[in-house]
Design a protein with these regions (language model features):
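Short, Lys/Arg-enriched N-terminal segments with co-localized hydrophobic residues
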Residues: 1-4
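Hydrophobic core
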Residues: 16-21
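Beta-strand-connecting loop/turn residues
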Residues: 13, 58, 99-101, 156, ...
Length: 393
């Protein structure tokens, strides 16, 4: 019996020694890539695509993470361009954080209209391959209005045919007047949207260089080539705003095949012009020299330009207001990047995209009144709403 116990003990010791000499092989648990994160303008995840909107000529960075942290891991991409397989691209390890390793792969640059489909792969020592995808994106590029011609006149609406600086699209620009002192711009880069007519009467004159449209309160001069526009208040004779000559007065970000991601408008601005508005803000009411996001965001402290009551409307000290009629994210660069101009950029729905904005002439009271006629007036609040309001902050 003692001999048997001794043999059992020896076998156990031998097995223990064998197991102690074996190096444990840990598996790759997972890989993650989320191209657009949580769709938060100010809070980006480390596993997004960058830039979020791939533009022609730019490198595109595909970021991902693997876990747990272990030596021997590899990450790479397979992708197609316009349906054609491309050479695989290896990802570079960037850093470790917590239980995760973070990676980045660069692809591109690509041309306008390219459609890229990709899948992210990972393995450990050539085994236990895991993947996530496929994902895809369209490559876009800015196109701009190069020239315009008088297209058609309907009751309350002037339609201009737009020639872009590239591509073969047939954009159209509609000009109308909801009232004599309000000018409305409606722009369709695909030229397939029916514009709304205005209510105010107007007269129109045309020569080889320009188109002049007048109401009892406004005179709008459209330069045909290169495209530009000048808006003048007939009551005061003052030039309200103008643009022209740069080739970027009216632009749209497109794949050239029907997808439109953004619009951009530009106007000249003298150094004396001041801008007020954009809803509730926490860092001053005058916005010249600042870039303002139109994005509803609940920032608890240190709000800066972040606001949960953002309004795409401003009043200019030159005697006009501009109202961008959109519920999508927009950004107003109020002579921040360029001290001689302001620009506004706005996202689109992608389907039947239309840029729609108004220039309203008058005193501050008249401009705000004109804006409220367009946006809608608030209803009277019930009696109980005038009682105590209390916050726990």
């Amino acid at each position: 019996e003692g001999c048997a116990l001794k043999k059992i003990f020896q076998v156990c010791i031998a097995l223990l020694l064998c197991f102690s000499l074996v190096t444990p092989a840990f598996a790759l648990d997972g890989i993650w890539h989320n191209p657009y994160g949580i769709d938060d303008l100010y809070d980006h995840e480390p596993t997004e695509i960058y830039p979020l909107t791939p533009i022609a000529g730019e490198m595109i960075y595909i970021k991902s993470t693997t876990w747990p942290i272990e030596p021997g891991q590899s990450v790479w991409l397979t992708y197609t361009k316009n349906g054609e397989p491309q050479q695989d691209v290896g990802a570079e390890w960037k850093y470790n954080d917590g239980n995760n390793s973070y990676w980045e792969a660069a692809i591109g640059p690509f041309a306008q209209g390219d459609v890229i489909e990709y899948t992210v792969y990972a393995d450990k020592d050539g085994q236990n391959t895991q993947s996530i995808g496929p994902f895809s994106f369209h490559v876009v590029e800015w196109e701009s209005a190069q020239s315009v011609e008088l297209g058609s006149q309907e009751e309350g609406l002037v339609v201009l045919n737009v020639t872009p600086d590239q591509g073969d699209s047939t954009p159209k620009l509609g000009l109308s007047f909801p009232s004599a002192d309000v000018l409305r711009f409606q722009f369709s880069p695909l030229g397939d949207v029916a514009f709304e007519a205005g209510a105010a009467d107007y007269s129109i004159e045309e020569d080889s260089n320009s188109i002049i449209i007048s109401t009892s309160a406004l005179e709008v001069t459209v330069t045909k080539s290169p495209y530009g526009v000048e808006v003048r208040d007939l009551d005061t004779g003052k030039l309200l705003t103008q643009n022209g000559g740069t080739g970027s007065e009216l632009s749209w970000l497109t794949d050239g095949a029907g997808l439109v991601k953004n619009f951009r408008g530009r106007y000249e601005s003298p150094s004396s012009e001041k801008f007020y508005g954009f809803g509730e803000r926490y860092n001053g009411i005058e916005k010249r020299g600042e870039t303002v996001d139109i994005y509803v965001y609940n920032q608890y402290q240190n709000q800066g330009e972040r606001s949960y009551l953002a309004v795409p409307f401003f009043y200019s000290s030159k005697g006009y207001g501009l109202y961008l009629d959109s519920t999508y994210y927009a950004q107003f660069d109020m002579a921040d990047s360029d001290p001689n101009q302001y620009t506004f950029t706005v996202n689109t729905s992608g389907d039947d995209p239309v840029l729609d904005y108004y220039i309203i002439s008058g005193t501050p009271e008249e401009v705000i009144g004109g804006y409220s006629e367009l946006s809608g007036k608030p209803q009277d609040m019930p009696k109980w709403a005038f009682g105590l309001w209390m916050s726990a902050n």
